[in-house]
């Protein structure tokens, strides 16, 4: 009798869990009553013939975050669930989370430094108003170019300023000058010097990383000639605030860096919260270099990219 019950319970379990039969359909198929089907399914679970495993993606996310915090010495690592490894989808999910994080984090009296780029603009578009007092929002790098490619630099900082009930502090300059001497002369302007100093004093910095791929935004803005692009592609893995670094996080071209205006990478290490929002397979090396250089102490990343970092790229 026990053997017959075992076989019947297994058959009922197969129909229920593998073939999606209802208990009534199983009863008709096996010529038994519906209550008997229910008892057989319970028996199958008790005997271990059926093992139900609930996959909680968020449990894995917490573990990934802890590993990243330890590996890179981060204050916080937030791993955001994104259904697919598609870059556009990842950016959408990270941007929503980034906006929520900023809404929760910014408090009265904070100075918030903001970069620009596709990810930053999407975060800005997701920002919700927050009643805070005395907050300053400052642009961390220049955003003017000769190209028709829109950086949305002005729109980005405007949206952040509106969210925190303040006026935006623009840095109305090219991010990369043709000549380092001209850049140094411009930096001496009283207004420009004050904006750059405010970016340096910001206790919160929000930024992403760029790549050195052909389609990288900075490569499409007309700042670099072909020789400079080739150099950056060969030596760099990415950029933060238009300052290029190698796999170890070191500045890879002092000549180009000297022409770049805005926050210095070393200043990001001194922030109360230096927040990097980035994800996607194309940015794995860039993120690794940025974290190795200790330019961020808070990371917002998707689980696909997080696993690549945990598995050493």
From Swiss-Prot:
GO terms for biological process: regulation of DNA-templated transcription initiation. The keyword Signal does not apply. Keywords: DNA-binding, Repressor, Transcription, Transcription regulation. It holds the Pfam family HTH_23. InterPro entries: NagB/RpiA_transferase-like (IPR037171), RNA_pol_sigma_r3/r4-like (IPR013324), SorC_transcr_regulators (IPR051054), Sugar-bd_dom_put (IPR007324). SUPFAM superfamilies: NagB/RpiA/CoA transferase-like, Sigma3 and sigma4 domains of RNA polymerase sigma factors. GO terms for molecular function: carbohydrate binding; cis-regulatory region sequence-specific DNA binding; identical protein binding. Disulfide bonds: none annotated. Residues 23-42 bind DNA. The keyword Transit peptide does not apply. Deoxyribose-5-phosphate is most likely the effector that modulates binding of DeoR to DNA. PANTHER family: TRANSCRIPTIONAL REGULATOR LSRR, TRANSCRIPTIONAL REGULATOR-RELATED. Belongs to the SorC transcriptional regulatory family. Homooctamer. Negative regulator of the dra-nupC-pdp operon. DeoR binds cooperatively to the operator DNA, which consists of a palindrome and a direct repeat sequence located 3' to the palindrome. This is Deoxyribonucleoside regulator. It comes from Bacillus subtilis (strain 168). The lineage of its organism: Bacteria, Bacillati, Bacillota, Bacilli, Bacillales.
